[in-house]
């Protein structure tokens, strides 16, 4: 085993041009690991805290020099000499050093950067791919991509209230074929939107962000694109939504301003149910607001047997909030975002907790991403079976798809694509 000898950090840019933290860890063996930390736009109120400088003269106050300083001073002082393979002890040492329930003193962006860089350095020393080091010998399941090809909500400057409209190539035989199918559908969608007179600018996650008026219109364009690409709806390709409902929830009401509609929780559930009855939607993320526990209970009762109901803002990859949801029978799937909780150890604990309770897991990017493809490895390491990493454009998104293709090739005959096994009624 090797000890940590040095930790360095720097301010780099994410995919939105905002600063974020990058960390490098060096071991006594000479092995090194580097990790860049993503950032979200529609963030849950219960997420671990991302430390920003607040200095308006730099990056409009979004600088992360304080977080970088914590890495190179406070955290290095505690971790220098620690054995890199003891990931749990390393992560717990940083949690204890921070001393807050939400990592607000050192910053989850500082802590996560170190946590992931340590894992990468150790994997390099052991001459193992990261997915194998973290997941062990049974890490061989390639996830179904949830490809966000139409962006709305906080991810785009258009009237669409729902944040993400995704396709899932469940009928593909391999992840490489799934990515190819997604690319072909994406190209058809661009052609269809352009011919209808809509712009084909892309949003934060690489999906198109046209000025469509409703979710129904967006789903209609996607359905036509799937068929134009030669695939069968519901058989080759299914749909998924991320409503990010907290963003349009206030005073007990869900206000879809773009569509001119307003609902209570029951009405919002009926709205989603109608869409799911008319399109091959198999998964809905954050269909209701993060603290509308009563509404979520009704949502799960009404739709949970036939649809995957994913908690993102609801659970924020936090094992404690997840356990509350499991106990209450709320939702049936966890969205996994490493920066919501802030360490690799806690992320793996959340996935294990979800799997033990029979909840599905979806590994996820953030809207502010980097070229770091770590979530592709973690999706395979944890046997999640599903991954959200944006559309088929922008290299910050395609970097993850390209890494999945590499992993599948490395695994050879041992590789398995999750495919239709992720469906509730498969």
Curated annotation (Swiss-Prot):
EC category name: lyase
Sites where the protein binds Mg(2+): 242, 285, 312
Active site as annotated: 205, 337
Subcellular location, record wording: Cytoplasm; Secreted; Cell surface
Source organism of the structure: Gluconobacter oxydans (strain 621H) (Gluconobacter suboxydans)
Reaction(s) catalysed by this chain's protein: (2R)-2-phosphoglycerate = phosphoenolpyruvate + H2O
Gene Ontology biological process: glycolytic process
Pfam families tied to this protein: Enolase_C, Enolase_N
EC number: 4.2.1.11
Family from the record: Belongs to the enolase family.
UniProt keyword annotation of Metal-binding present: yes
MF GO annotations: magnesium ion binding; phosphopyruvate hydratase activity
Protein name in UniProt: Enolase
Pathway involvement of the protein, from the record: Carbohydrate degradation; glycolysis; pyruvate from D-glyceraldehyde 3-phosphate: step 4/5
């Amino acid at each position: 085993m090797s000890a940590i000898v040095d930790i360095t950090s720097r301010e780099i840019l994410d995919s939105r041009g905002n600063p974020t933290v990058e960390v490098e860890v060096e071991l006594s063996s000479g092995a090194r690991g580097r990790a860049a930390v993503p950032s979200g736009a529609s963030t849950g109120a219960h997420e671990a805290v991302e430390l920003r400088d607040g200095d308006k003269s730099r990056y409009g106050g979004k600088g992360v020099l304080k977080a970088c300083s914590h890495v190179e001073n406070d955290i290095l002082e505690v971790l220098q000499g620690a054995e890199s393979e003891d990931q749990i002890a390393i992560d717990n040492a940083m949690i204890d050093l921070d001393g807050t329930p939400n990592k607000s003193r050192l910053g989850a962006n500082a802590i996560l950067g170190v946590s992931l860089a340590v894992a990468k350095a150790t994997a390099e020393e052991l001459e193992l791919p990261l997915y194998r080091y973290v997941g062990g010998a049974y890490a061989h399941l390639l996830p179904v991509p949830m490809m966000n090809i139409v962006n709305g909500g906080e991810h785009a400057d258009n009237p669409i209230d729902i944040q993400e409209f995704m396709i899932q190539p469940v009928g593909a035989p391999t992840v490489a074929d799934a990515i190819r199918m997604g690319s072909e559908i994406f190209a058809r969608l661009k052609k269809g939107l352009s011919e209808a007179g809509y712009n084909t600018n892309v949003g934060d996650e690489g999906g198109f962000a046209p000025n469509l008026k409703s979710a129904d219109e967006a789903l209609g364009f996607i359905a036509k694109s799937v068929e134009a690409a030669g695939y069968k709806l519901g058989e080759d390709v299914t749909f998924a939504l991320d409503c990010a409902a907290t963003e349009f929830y206030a005073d007990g009401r869900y206000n879809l301003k773009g569509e001119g509609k307003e609902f209570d929780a029951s009405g919002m559930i009926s709205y989603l149910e109608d869409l799911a009855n008319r399109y091959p939607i198999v998964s809905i993320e954050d269909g209701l607001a993060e603290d509308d526990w009563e509404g979520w209970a009704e949502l799960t009762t009404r739709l949970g047997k036939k649809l995957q109901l994913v908690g993102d803002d609801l659970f924020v990859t936090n094992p404690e909030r997840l356990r509350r949801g499991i106990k209450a029978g709320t939702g049936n799937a966890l969205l996994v975002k490493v920066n919501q909780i802030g360490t690799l150890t806690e992320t793996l604990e959340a996935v294990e907790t979800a799997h033990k309770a029979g909840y599905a897991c979806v590994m996820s990017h953030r809207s502010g991403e980097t070229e770091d493809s770590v979530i592709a490895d973690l999706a395979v390491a944890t046997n999640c079976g599903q991954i959200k990493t944006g559309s088929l454009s922008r290299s910050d998104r395609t970097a993850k798809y390209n890494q999945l293709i590499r992993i599948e090739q490395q695994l050879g005959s041992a590789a398995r694509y999750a495919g239709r096994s992720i469906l509730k009624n498969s």
